[in-house]
Amino acid sequence: QSQLEAVFAAVNNLSAQTDPNFKAPVATDADKIVTSIPEQLAREIAATQMATPEGFNVHPKLSPQLAKRVESLNDASIDWSTGEMLAFGSLLKEGRPIRLAGQDARRGTFSNRHAVIVDKENGNEWTPLRALISDENQFFVVDSLLSEYAAMGFEYGYSVEREEALVLWEGQFGDF
């Protein structure tokens, strides 16, 4: 009990140790950071969207959206979901594990992501970007329950334990 009280007193009596006038340093080499990917890699990533497994039944309204991702590379009309797909795919190709969680993360809040596609006939699932990696455990997109603190707490803990991974939690639109 005395140790607990001593720790409480030490934490409770902390003095301010940061300068309220602190200014973050300005990055001077920002223009030297290369964030682009080669066109061939972009095309390889986009091609996963049309590599439907044999016997898999993609919903007829979804097929054109997936095809548009591939076509958008030809006319430079890349939308948000295609850009996200290219970013995730390029990170996977570099060997970086990715975990994305949120109440509607697999489909995307506005029906835009489609990271996991469900067969309309039998409910089987297909995760197109997993075609880029040999270990499917390197890419997880999961729908979590609508419990922000619990979901964020788990994802935070996951990110601490797996520092090399890109761990994201996506809040559901309108829930805040």
Predicted stretch roles:
Residues 1-176:
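Flexible, glycine-rich loop/tail regions that form catalytic "lids" or insertion modules at the edges
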